[in-house]
């Protein structure tokens, strides 16, 4: 089985491509910082929607623990100010964000990842930046 790390994962198009061509693989981790995209990834590629129905069974009671975890991986990130938005999330969204990141094994901001803590992988893949946030090309 191919062990995959998916950087700049977006909604998981690289994962979808591997599935579509019949590759036997396991995603051992991802790197993504956009909050809403992460929840989409979790809804598509995990049992996020099912677990969300009983979310209190899967998240800590302590809000600060959830915030600390999200700040540590720098999720969600505000692209205009490059500030972490975890403290600004209202409780339902904070719980959703925490659960989604845990389920999909998100290591968060690629600039902050300690490579020594990454799981072993055979394939490192990535997606290109979303056009609405890329600084490349005509401005």
Describe the role of every protein-language-model region:
Residues 1-139:
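Conserved active-site and SAM-binding loop architecture
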């Amino acid at each position: 089985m191919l062990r995959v790390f998916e950087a700049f994962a977006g909604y998981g198009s690289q994962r979808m491509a591997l599935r579509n061509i019949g590759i036997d693989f396991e995603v051992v981790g991802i790197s993504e910082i956009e909050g809403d995209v992460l929840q989409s990834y979790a809804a598509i590629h995990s049992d996020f929607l099912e677990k969300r129905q009983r979310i209190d069974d899967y998240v800590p009671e302590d809000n600060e623990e959830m915030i600390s975890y999200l700040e540590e991986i720098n999720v969600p990130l505000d692209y205009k100010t490059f500030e972490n938005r975890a403290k600004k999330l209202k409780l339902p969204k904070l719980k959703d964000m925490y659960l989604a990141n845990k389920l999909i094994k998100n290591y968060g901001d690629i600039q902050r990842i300690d490579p020594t803590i990454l799981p072993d992988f055979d394939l490192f893949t990535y997606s290109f930046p979303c056009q609405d946030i890329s600084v490349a090309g005509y401005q």
